[in-house]
């Protein structure tokens, strides 16, 4: 081989090595820092910059509903007063009724798609289990996302001009300007990002720190390569993500579907009156760490036989300390707030777990993790949206 050929081969080899080194940087996942906690805040939220010019808005993360909405500067009788100035829409933001995004949202919310009354806009109404509701129109605007190429996709979301409060609404909207609804659907933000090629897989996940905070990610690049327990997603549970029926080792057989959801008070709710319990010590308790040694881990078991999978729930994930120093079981009676036979795994149960919702393969996964740094990557820093 001539010296020129050898030199050219060496140059190509170096170029290939540089390309391989760059591959890990070409991620399609989007990571957001989570704020809030299970108690006493009662919600986890992300900050997103929306519009042109971009303005910050805090969005309460809800994996049980498919609608993302902001409180708009056109209220009728809204009771919500968020931390930032209300979003101000323009006529160019309005999504018409015959738009595919409107069709998807109406389908996700179980609404009739009828454009005869208001063909120029996409109206919606959505009610939550706790009595909260949002009435509004669908808009589209730019979202500034923390990606390598600084994507600013045009995404559809709700402009809520009439919000009615439920049991938790007053507390939640002190911290939030709206809701980031990423429940199962075809018009939710994660689905839109996949459709626009911003992420390659319709997968998202979250990790909730036991002392608050954590992270949320969209896309499959941040899924751990090993150590994840997977179960199939149950069907026919609406917009909830569910691993199906489960057994909780509190001598409670949860024969009805279990929904995995980050919403409401972030406490787990099951259909059993016996679970609302509190205890008092001689002196008021200040921290869960002071009493967790007196409790044993619980287990949630899904499936049967070879397909059986178990999630261990340490004491710090199912007990809470109240402001008055009582120790309470953080598992509430869901039938009292209209959940009927649906049991919800709340944010408290999922603390210090990375939870993965894989819509590509219709499965849910979890793994124990530190929620203050990404697995195998640099420590988590706040997202600059």
What is the role of each PLM region?
Residues 74-76, 149-150, 186, 222-223, ...:
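Acidic glycine-/aspartate-rich tracts in secreted/extracellular proteins
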Residues 181:
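C-terminal reverse transcriptase regions that engage the nucleic-acid substrate
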Residues 32, 39-155, 159-168, 266-277, ...:
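Signature of the N-terminal lobe/flap region of pepsin-like aspartyl proteases
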Residues 44, 66, 139, 153, ...:
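Residues that flank catalytic or metal-binding motifs in active/ligand-binding sites
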